[in-house]
Amino acid sequence: MGTLSVNQNKLQKRLRRLAGEAVADFNMIEEGDKVMVCLSGGKDSYTLLDVLMHFQKVAPIRFDIVAVNMDQKQPGFPEHVLPAYLKELGVEYHIVEKDTHSVVKELIPEGKTTCSLCSRLRRGTLYTFADQIGATKMALGHHRDDIIETFFLNMFFNGALKAMPPKLRADDGRNVVIRPLAYCHEKDIQAYSDLKQFPIIPCNLCGSQENLQRQVVKDMLLDWERKTPGRTESIFRALQNVQPSQLADRKLFDFSQLRIDETAASRFVNVVNI
């Protein structure tokens, strides 16, 4: 890729700035970290690797990057694409081979959504591999839109106010997941991916299925944004401004102990003298 135009340069700077803010806000990367960057072959993970490699050059701290892709043995998966790309970049990488495709096809009936099971199997394998190579952080390519969509998916279908945190300690306690693109917009990532001409690998197992719940939510949010620009930005800010006393979760707030504060100043108003 040659010299960037003014708009292309602004796009690159915006992505790097927003990712840098997220990394700083949540203390995602520290001195001496070994960051395992999970690559799927999609636009998000390519952009993530690109941004983190830039940070590695300019950040005031030292950290290592290891790129990891999981070959799930999907039919037609172009095994040569990622190794060739990563060799050209000169970044350390590993290809983890595990046939989760057969497991998913065996357990999920034809026509049903495979994404959830596929994701769980992939996550477990990557957690194990991160532990094996001594990675201190596992970087995923989820962005701002993913986080908002996940919030609504959990609310609509799981009855929970839960999204994707920018930083998370896994249930096993041995892995810390970071999402440096948490503040970045999907449209910017798509534009940057097109600009950089990343060798995109489509997901033939789940990405082509129609009527997935996530796509329904995505379409809903796009429609909201068209009708009321700025609504999704407000939703994202709300995820950073939680007020437990204004909800109804007794595990987060002890409503049972609420009493009148006898020491509080009186709010009596003398109506006669007004």
Curated annotation (Swiss-Prot):
Cofactor(s) this protein requires: Mg(2+); [4Fe-4S] cluster
Ligand binding ([4Fe-4S] cluster): 115, 118, 206
Pathway recorded for this protein: tRNA modification
**Pfam families to which the protein is assigned, alphabetical:** ATP_bind_3
Compartments, record wording: Cytoplasm
Query: What is the UniProt remark on how the cofactor binds and its stoichiometry?
Result: Binds 1 [4Fe-4S] cluster per subunit. The cluster is chelated by three Cys residues, the fourth Fe has a free coordination site that may bind a sulfur atom transferred from the persulfide of IscS.
List the SUPFAM superfamilies. Answer: Adenine nucleotide alpha hydrolases-like
Primary location group: cytoplasm
| Motif mapping: PP-loop motif | 40-45
**A molecular-function term among this protein's GO annotations:** tRNA binding
Instruction: Alphabetically list the UniProt keywords.
Output: 4Fe-4S, ATP-binding, Cytoplasm, Iron, Iron-sulfur, Magnesium, Metal-binding, Nucleotide-binding, RNA-binding, Transferase, tRNA processing, tRNA-binding
Q: Quick one: a GO cellular component term?
A: cytoplasm
Q: What is its EC number?
A: 2.8.1.-
* Single biological process term from Gene Ontology: tRNA thio-modification
Quote the catalytic activity from the record.
Answer: cytidine(32) in tRNA + S-sulfanyl-L-cysteinyl-[cysteine desulfurase] + AH2 + ATP = 2-thiocytidine(32) in tRNA + L-cysteinyl-[cysteine desulfurase] + A + AMP + diphosphate + H(+)
- Function per UniProt: Catalyzes the ATP-dependent 2-thiolation of cytidine in position 32 of tRNA, to form 2-thiocytidine (s(2)C32). The sulfur atoms are provided by the cysteine/cysteine desulfurase (IscS) system.
> Its family?
Belongs to the TtcA family.
Assembly state and interactors? Homodimer.
Q: What else is known?
A: The thiolation reaction likely consists of two steps: a first activation step by ATP to form an adenylated intermediate of the target base of tRNA, and a second nucleophilic substitution step of the sulfur (S) atom supplied by the hydrosulfide attached to the Fe-S cluster.
Q: What is this protein called?
A: tRNA-cytidine(32) 2-sulfurtransferase
The species this protein belongs to is Pseudomonas syringae pv. tomato (strain ATCC BAA-871 / DC3000)
